[in-house]
Amino acid sequence: MAIHKILTLGDPLLREKSQPVRKITSNVWKLLDNLADTMYDAPGVGLAAPQIGVLKRVIVVDVGEGLTELINPEVIAASGEEVGAEGCLSIPGAQGEVPRAAVVTVRGLDRHGRVREIRAEGLYARALQHEIDHLDGILFIDKVVRWLENQPGER
């Protein structure tokens, strides 16, 4: 387990689309561990593999209710809309209001290859959507409807 440098705005890897994990190996377990260590050290509530330079569809989230690890996550259902404040470990100092689905169902694999289906709302739903966006090269600044702090250089 290790703490990695978090890539910041302007690094082209943050805009790349991540590849699905085809086989869960010890390297994927190590990636999950490193993501969690890096997220907690930052500290943050979520981190996606591209943020540490790995273009794989892997995320971790912990909004205070325990660690969620997901491999190849996808939103399979979404309802309602809430606008809420977001920031990002890859864009230090920037915060903005972002519209997101109020309730989502996310499907992915756990570290043992078992299918997990999570119904989430509130901050948990927001964090899952934010991290899944990272896997497609989408940053929260692409969706901001109102800035709360300093505006970053890229839109």
Curated annotation (Swiss-Prot):
InterPro entries: Peptide_deformylase (IPR023635), Peptide_deformylase_sf (IPR036821). The keyword Ion transport does not apply. Its cofactor is Fe(2+). It catalyses: N-terminal N-formyl-L-methionyl-[peptide] + H2O = N-terminal L-methionyl-[peptide] + formate. Keywords: Hydrolase, Iron, Metal-binding, Protein biosynthesis. The keyword Signal does not apply. This is Peptide deformylase. It comes from Moorella thermoacetica (strain ATCC 39073 / JCM 9320). The gene is def.
